[in-house]
Amino acid sequence: IRLYELYDYVTLFLIAESNLTLSGKPKSLYLKENWSRFARYHNKIRRVEIDLMNSINKTKDVWYNERTMRDEGIRLALPDSKKDFLLLTSDLDEIPKFHFIQTLASCQLHTPFQSLLLQCDFYYYSFGFRHAPDPYFPGVTVSRFSPNDKIPLNLRESRFHNRPMFSTCFHCSYCFDHLETVRLKIASFSHTELNIPKYHDQKYIIDCFRNGKDLYDRHGVRFRHVNINEIELPRLVQVKRERFMYMLDRSSPNAGFRDV
């Protein structure tokens, strides 16, 4: 979805992956193992592998591992450039909208350039549930660099000092088509305190996804049902609606999961 949305408007996709989760568990190198599926995008992808073993052995702080993943990814993947460039950093599920990037690329940018923080339209489980207390998620950073500039290692952490740009990206959290992927995320991500049996229960997960309930019982967190036909969607989701129906409608008895 991300590659389709941005392919015509970016110079290079820098993608970092590791064979360990942030909590230190073995995982597949998904992009490497499925490389042929993305053949049409190969000429604009630079993939690097991050060795998290030293980081994981060094500390029990899973957030340190997450920072290492981001920082090492930028350090290893960023090519030598002979001219100024814009660097966008984000998680995989934070997708800039193509028309914003198209506009940004056509602009005469001021020097010095004030870094941007793209505020994503924030959805949960599918594009049918909008995060109600916080409809925007502070995700993508946009920074400008010259060839001799040293790239800071805290672009993600310092993003709240950037200029906010609202509704310029998508963030669809837990928009998975397999229930086992939900369980895998719970077992793998940095919030290890949430990895408890209740949140792995199949009936519980399906109920949350079908009815827009918070998976983790967090106080004040709720989701608002929205009309899919009245919102903006990523381009590939628009043209392949049947393929991505789980991102559009979770009301079926299996909540759109292909493995249930």
Go through each PLM region and give its residues.
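Conserved catalytic core of nucleotide-sugar-dependent glycosyltransferases
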Residues: 94-200
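C-terminal accessory extensions appended to soluble enzyme cores
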Residues: 164-260
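Catalytic phosphate/metal-binding cores of nucleic-acid and nucleotide-processing enzymes, i.e., regions
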Residues: 1, 71, 75-77, 81, ...
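A general structural motif
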Residues: 10, 82-84, 113, 166
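Hydrophobic targeting segments
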Residues: 11-15
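A short acidic, amphipathic alpha-helical/loop segment
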Residues: 1-5, 100-103
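Short, conserved loop/helix-junction motifs that constitute active-site signature segments
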Residues: 6-9, 39-41, 109-110
